[in-house]
Amino acid sequence: MALDKRIWMHFDLLPFVFIIPLLVVSFLLIFESSAVLSLKQGVYYAIGFILFWIVFFIPFRKLGRWLFVFYWACVILLALVDFMGYSKLGAQRWLVIPFISITLQPSEPVKIAILLLLAHLIKINPPPFKGYDWGMFLKLSFYICLPAALILKQPDLGTALIVLIMGFGILLIVGLRTRVWLPLFIALLVASPIAYHFLHDYQKKRIADFLSEKPNYHVMQSIIAIGSGGFLGKSKEACTQTKFKFLPIATSDFIFAYFVERFGFLGAMLLFAIYIGLSLHLFFYLFESNSDWFLKIVALGISILIFVYSSVNIAMTLGLAPVVGIPLPLFSYGGSSFITFMILFGILENLLAFRYIFGYNSKPSFGNFGFLAQLVRALGS
């Protein structure tokens, strides 16, 4: 039942050197705050790792048209939110799965769908030396903007911006001709003040609070918690901001402030190093000499997501960005974001582990392969 050892030779263990410490410390903080929440988080961890291994055995390079099916299925789910979505905290972002009463947030799987489809389209149409021209750019932009518009309608400005930054960040880094990106950049600068008038009142208030001289209550308490942590942090009993509930949403949106109060400036620097190291490690796959664009785009997309999520969340807790509901990746309490990232890492590890052994188009002899490796090959043929 063992996997062929050659698969493990290409399995990238370094991401887990970064991920495991995040999960351990996150679980500790959540447990200190609430034993009940820590049990739920443990369930999310279990689901995430189970899905990681399930996804690891899916032959993504062979899916082809099925990636379009997955994409459009996610778009349909996003559209259904407008008609039969479940509202919570003033936003309609969830669907209730019949008979089992479990809520699904379609904006999470759609990130995976967009990334896989972009990887597939770029693989079959690699960027020319000078970058993509208007034709290919508009084609790829359609698949990015359609779900982003549906997410924005929910309304969920934060997630919509994440989708746009991931999608267009990939296109910009992969390569666009100057006559494409320069007018787009100018148009963005001109359109930004106009777009402000189309925001919801609560979104305008967040921007106004951010620009005001005095931060709002949530951000103020977050800054106090961060400052009170000192260089080495405090014991659990001495974390007054969290203990006495001054710090809002201490295990979710503002968990960075809770972490710094607990582990201080030194802990914050280590956390920065983990996120920067993980993002750069994934980003550097783009510079591999081979022409495996599917792998490069998936790794680049995950890198952008981790960098943007962590940067925005930390900036938000420091009062350097408007307060939006963006979690700290692989660290904040909750299942949706964590499970999404574990699925993405499962896809990445699949692309790494099986790219040389099977080639997906070759027909090797199966005699020397383990049972599970043969099963993967059979599913992909």
UniProtKB/Swiss-Prot annotation:
Q: Does the keyword Lipid metabolism apply?
A: no
Q: What is its EC number?
A: 2.4.99.28
The function of this protein is: Peptidoglycan polymerase that is essential for cell wall elongation.
Q: Quote the protein name from its UniProt record.
A: Peptidoglycan glycosyltransferase MrdB
- Family that this chain belongs to: Belongs to the SEDS family. MrdB/RodA subfamily.
Q: Which gene encodes it?
A: mrdB
The family database entries (HAMAP family) matched by this protein are listed as: PGT_RodA
GO biological process assignments: cell division; cell wall organization; peptidoglycan biosynthetic process; regulation of cell shape
